[in-house]
């Protein structure tokens, strides 16, 4: 997918996500308009229930909007079938979750190799890429460790390596420090800062002001709408 500096990687136009629960109708997203350009570093903040995770799920092609338009590097996502969406998730977007979402019985190396199974790569090439990704996050000496042998910060580093191993255009992080203590949180944020500095587009959901302060742009949601969208100094 090609891009130019003036072209938005992500374009959201009048985006809605509506849930019907019996007689009740919930607008999780209520007419959202957002553009995000390549190499931006964006925090999405807001109270619980404001629509943050719903927005991330739609951007990450884990959910579909009820109406409105979502374009990913100029391509209408709403027109894609499930196979095309799966390909986007595997190749274009890397995910980091609060709960790590690692395979409990697999080593760090095998966890990071997992997204590459769907690529036309030899096992040796998959292994080499996974080793490189783990070394990038400072875990080159823990390749054979399982999640239960790692600290919370180390598990999140494995999750970040897994997100980056396929060289995606966009990194989505949903409360990446939510389960970590303050010191480990800052270590993880230093790593995410480095990922952004190396050219990655990073979009992060957080409710913590000190974590949002790492980003260059802050979008606050309230009741499914954009309350404000502000730039901030590095």
Language model feature labels by segment:
Residues 1-18, 228-234:
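ABC-family P-loop ATPase nucleotide-binding domain
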Residues 7-222:
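ABC family nucleotide-binding domain
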Residues 224-226:
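Generic detector of short, aliphatic-rich beta-strand segments that form the cores of beta-sheets
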């Amino acid at each position: 997918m090609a891009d130019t500096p003036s072209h938005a990687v992500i374009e959201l136009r009048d985006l809605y996500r509506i849930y019907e629960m019996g007689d009740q109708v919930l607008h999780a997203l209520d007419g959202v308009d957002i553009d995000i350009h390549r190499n931006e570093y964006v925090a999405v903040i807001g109270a619980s229930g404001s629509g943050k995770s719903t927005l991330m799920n739609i951007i990450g092609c884990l959910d579909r909007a009820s109406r409105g338009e979502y374009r990913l590097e100029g391509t209408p996502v709403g027109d894609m079938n499930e196979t095309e969406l799966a390909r986007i998730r595997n190749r274009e977007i890397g995910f980091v979750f609060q709960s790590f979402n690692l395979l409990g019985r697999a080593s760090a190396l095998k966890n990071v190799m997992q997204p590459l199974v769907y690529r036309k790569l030899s096992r040796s090439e998959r292994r080499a890429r996974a080793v490189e990704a783990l070394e990038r996050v400072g875990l080159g000496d823990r390749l054979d460790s399982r999640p239960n042998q790692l600290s919370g910060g180390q598990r999140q580093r494995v999750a970040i390596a897994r997100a980056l191993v396929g060289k995606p255009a966009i990194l989505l992080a949903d409360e990446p420090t939510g389960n970590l203590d303050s010191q480990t949180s800052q270590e993880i944020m230093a790593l995410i800062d480095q990922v952004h500095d190396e050219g990655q587009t990073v979009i992060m959901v957080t409710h913590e002001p000190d974590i949002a302060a790492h980003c260059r742009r802050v979008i606050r949601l309230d009741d499914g709408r954009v309350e404000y969208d502000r730039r901030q100094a590095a």
